[in-house]
Amino acid sequence: MDKTQSRLRRARQTRIKIAELQVARLAVHRTNTHIYAQVFSPCGTKVLASASTLEAEVRAQLADQTGKGGNVAAATLIGKRIAEKAKAAGIESVAFDRSGFRYHGRVKALADAAREAGLKF
């Protein structure tokens, strides 16, 4: 089993446990250059809010700061944006789905920023 398969196996187990809870899910995906966050409905079929470093507004802000989307500063910005969008959609509490990634670096920065912006998990 290689690194990617192990990550996907961990993600699958987490998603099964979150589905049993029947709560909204904040899913995070990261690549070398970008980070993405989505809030899914409790049934898991609808995306209620999303934010990523591909959005034009985010890219403009990042160009002023660092010029890149694959760093902790970008993850912090995405964490704040996803919390604001989730609250606007009426979501106060979510389950955090790190998609099998270690809770470290960019994933941790996104989670901490979302918590500071008022999202509970």
Curated annotation (Swiss-Prot):
Superkingdom assignment: Bacteria
Gene Ontology cellular-component annotations: cytosolic large ribosomal subunit
GO BP term (any one): translation
SUPFAM superfamilies, sorted: Translational machinery components (SSF53137)
This protein's UniProt keywords: Ribonucleoprotein, Ribosomal protein, RNA-binding, rRNA-binding
Pfam families: Ribosomal_L18p (PF00861)
InterPro entries, per database record: Ribosomal_uL18_bac-type, Ribosomal_uL18_bac/euk
UniProt keyword Ribosomal protein, yes or no: yes
CDD domains: Ribosomal_L18_L5e (cd00432)
Record-level Gene Ontology MF annotations: 5S rRNA binding; structural constituent of ribosome
HAMAP family: Ribosomal_uL18_B
Complexes and interactors: Part of the 50S ribosomal subunit; part of the 5S rRNA/L5/L18/L25 subcomplex. Contacts the 5S and 23S rRNAs.
Role: This is one of the proteins that bind and probably mediate the attachment of the 5S RNA into the large ribosomal subunit, where it forms part of the central protuberance.
Family: Belongs to the universal ribosomal protein uL18 family.
Name under which the protein is recorded: Large ribosomal subunit protein uL18
Organism from which the protein derives: Paraburkholderia xenovorans (strain LB400)
